[in-house]
Every structure is written in C-alpha cells, then in structure tokens.
C-alpha cells in the first residue's frame, strides 16, 4: 500500500472511531435523562416535586429553616389550610338542645292523642311542628304553650305501629319515637284499690283491679315496683294481685301499673306503704301483748304510744283506731301501738277486764317505762250505764299536770276539727284500770290519758271519732 492509500485508510478509521464515541455519549445522556425523569413525582397538591439523593439537592427553593418567621416578619400570603392563621375563622360546631317526644300508647277512636315535646330539662317546647305517621298517613300539628301537639285519631279499632317525629330547628335537635298505638272503640275504664298501706313484714300488698263500675278484672298483668325492683303479678278471679313483702321495717314508695288490654283503659297508682314490725312482748295462757311500729315520721323526736285491747269487750273502738293507725304513712310524729289480744275469751265481764289489765301491768308498763314516750293514750269505750258521759277524755285521778295539759289541748284540737263536737274533759267517779297501767306510767314520768267513746254508736261514728282523735294527737305538740 502506498503512502497515500495508507493515510486515507487511517483517516477513515479515525472518523469511524469518533462516530462510535459520539453514539456512546449520546446513549449515556439519554439514560441520565430517563433516571432523572423517573424521580419526578406528584404530591397531594398536584405540584410536581423533584426528588434528589442530595439533601441540599438541586431544589430552587430556600431551605425551610432559612424561611422560618423571625421576630415580626410575616408571610404576606397566609396558608388557607393553616388553622392558626389569624385571618381564617375557626369553625365551631353548634350544640343543639336535645328534645324528647312522648305519649300514651292508646287512644279512644275519634278522640285526640296528646303528644308531648320537651327539652332536656323536661320543659315544654311550644310552637313547633310535630308529625305522626299511622297506617301510611302522616298528620301534623303545632305544639301549644304546654308543648302538646294534638292528633285526632279516626282509624278503626286495632293496634297500629306509629312514628312520632320532630325535625328540629336552629335551636332544638330533632327527635323521633315509635310505638304501638292501641285504638279503642268501646273503652272500659278501670281503677285500682289498695287494701292496706301498713303491711307487716312477711305479709302481702294486696291490689285489686276493677272496672269503675266495680266489676273485678281477672287474668290481667299488674306491674309493682318497690325498693328498686319490679314484680309482675296476674290478677285472680276477684281482681286481686298479691305481692309478698319481705323488706325491713320502713316506708317505701310503690308504683303500680296496669297497661290495659283490649278495651280496658290503663291505670296506674303511686303510693307509699309502711312496712311494720310486730314483736310479741308478753304471753300467758289467756292472752298476748304485741308491740307494733314504727308508724308515721321516723325522724320525729316526738314519740307517742296507743294502747288498744285493755278491755276486750270494747273492741269496736280498738279495732277502728288500730286499723286506721297501721295504714297511716304521712304523720308529724313517731307512733307505736301496744295491742292486747285475749286468746281465752271465756269468763265473766269482770274476768275478761282483769285479764287485759294484768297483761298491761306485767308487759306494757315495764316496756313503756324504758321508751321515753312523750305521751301514752289508752283507748276505751263505755256502755253509758255506769257513766253519764259517753264521749270524753280524762287523766286518772287528775294527778299529773303534764298529762292534764295534753288532755285538755287534745280536746281543744278535736273541737277545732269536729264542728259542734260534744267531747269534754270528765273524770269518772269509778275507775278500775288506772292502777294497772295509767298510774304506774304517770309515776314513771310518762304523760298518759284515757279516751272514751260510746260502745253502741254506729260504726261510722266510731270510725269518725277515731280518725279525729288521730288527727288531733298529731298536732298536740305543735
């Protein structure tokens, strides 16, 4: 090869070598560009961000630490999402007053159902729209000043699912209520009767369910709530529902409810019952003495005792006062009863009297002396044969001023209660019982007097006089 050809050949090789190097460099540049593109991402705000391995990278933004607000320097463009920005008002959720809707679950056909709208403090909410949906139809009414929305129910007699609704407003929260509404075409009204309000431990609370016409309603469910527990009882043929009471002696609030069924209208009663204790303090082959209490105000500092049964033949006034007293709940003072019961009633009039007197002497007097009574009242009646007066109070032998004072004040109180009362203070010429009970108590410092009424008066008169005496005694220390 001559020199000229050799130079030409070398020039071609150099040219090819240069082209090859250029292609390799272009490839590397393309690869760097791709790698850089793959690191471009989007943040939540939709603005692309360049990521780099170098923390100081190639970002054109100033380091955040360098842009921190110093002193009084402020950012001229506040961030609308910054909750601390003073130019942005903080949103506070408004709290609405809670509301409730209520009504009974029955209505008489073509009569009004009252729906009550109240706030959380049980205050009536007036001038608000309430709706009632029954059998696919929605009725509306505006509450009156008592918070009552009245709905005239004309549906056929049966039970319907009903929805009550209040939509609420800018002050009151919405509320709704669903119930099964019993529409009654021919209502039968009912009533409850409580047999007694004084119940001895272990005895029964007796509740009678009857129509207002007096017909017993059998096989009905009665709910009785006492001392925080609710008991269900079914009425018997005579309408009686019974609940055995095994609570300690005290006064209890009782709620009794009958929800109604068929055409029977619901009825409820809230009462107080006094659970009593009865203690046997003396016993012989002819009689017993019971100590019964507490009756009335258990917190009172005034303690009073009645004595009944001293003379068994005078039982009418004994029975009347005893039954009335044990059923008393709301009284000012604290009361007890000593009850003498003869188990052997065979013998003469004087024999029976002496038995009662001996039971009083041997059991009542020793017990009563230790009780610090403010007053003891012995209950009697007279035939009017030996005594010319038949309605009176007296202190045996007129020997105790505190007893005399209380006796005379009781007479004044009876006269203030009973118009044209014939009661008076009178001391009988003959008295058989004082040595056995009254005089020993007076000697011990316990004020004592005797109440007498006529043995042959009508029962209604005896009951009336017992009632008035109880009322008067409950004011005697005022």
Model-derived features with residue positions:
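Sec-dependent N-terminal signal peptides of Gram-positive bacterial secreted proteins and lipoproteins
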Residues: 4-27
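Enriched for extracellular/lumenal, surface-exposed ectodomains of secreted and cell-surface proteins
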Residues: 134, 159-179, 226, 251-271
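Glycine-centered loop-to-beta-strand initiation motif
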Residues: 143-151, 235-243
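Surface-exposed, short loops/turns at beta-strand junctions within beta-sandwich domains
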Residues: 152-159, 244-251
